[in-house]
Amino acid sequence: KVDWLSADESNVDDYIADPLCGADATVGLFRQMLHGIRFNQRMSHLRQMDKDMPVLFVAGDKDPVGSCGKGVRQTYDAFRQAGMRDCTLKLYPGLRHEILNEKAYAAEITKDIETWLLSRLEK
């Protein structure tokens, strides 16, 4: 089943019922995704990034795709170690993969992202 998508059962049910969702992922998709992850975690690549570029990491701490927050934290830590000066990490307790589709939390998360973006625009 696809319970990993959302803590909200109605979101999971909607996903299952939607004929446009749930297509099988191809080997090529996984290959490209894993290549991107490895590329983005190589310190030599991270050190080439603009150190003043703000980066926001948001995820649910129960998202198995991000190893329940561990993978996101590792990426955040790697960015910081590479000298990125403005990295922010926000893990939402109890939430899974589709944090912006969590009906009970979407407004709060959207507001958090908006607040973060606006604060960077003011600099």
Where are these regions (language model features)?
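Class I S-adenosyl-L-methionine
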Residues: 16, 73-80
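Structured catalytic core of nucleotide-sugar glycosyltransferases
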Residues: 58, 72-73, 89
